[in-house]
Amino acid sequence: MRRTFSVAVYPRHQGKVLMIRHKRLGIWLPPGGELMPGETPLEAAARELREETGLEGRFPVVSDIDGTPAGLIGYEEHVAGSKGIHMNFVFVADVDTDAVQPNDEFEEWRWVDSFDDIGGPPNVAQLGRLAVTARPRFNDVSG
């Protein structure tokens, strides 16, 4: 089975995180996508955030573990249909505005502070709750 590295980014602004309704899948997810050759997960997270939403993010250092990329709040794996298994690095990024410029992957979006009615895979809500509460340990890294 094919394996692909991917990223998900929970952008947050004024205590809420951005969720998009994925056109093809029909479920609420954070922005994200696959890593390009030679890209680090953090570079991919910043690129996907910018490409999908028009937002620029600052990725706070949220882990005390030396060598952990800024903004990394988790890792999960899921089957992505014909794309095989996505090995997914999950990030949080602070953004200065809630003005989203959607791309062709979604038309609906919303800023949420509760994940009780978000639906979709349980880990989307679990990671979303973590993104809302993750606190910086040191300096932010711009994406």
Regions found by a protein language model. Give the residues of each.
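Conserved N-terminal beta-strand and adjoining loop/helix that marks the start
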Residues: 1-17, 90
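Conserved Nudix-box catalytic region and its N-terminal flanking loop in Nudix hydrolases
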Residues: 12-51, 55-58
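Short, solvent-exposed aromatic-acidic interface loops
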Residues: 23-25, 66-67, 107-110
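Residues that recognize and position ribonucleotide moieties
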Residues: 28, 84, 110
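Functional cleft and adjacent loop/helix regions within the main domain
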Residues: 31, 37, 78, 140-143
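Active-site segment of metal-dependent pyrophosphate-handling enzymes
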Residues: 54-98
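Class I (Rossmann-like) S-adenosyl-L-methionine-dependent methyltransferase catalytic domain
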Residues: 69, 74-81, 120-123, 130-131, ...
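NUDIX/MutT-family hydrolases
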Residues: 88-92, 99-134
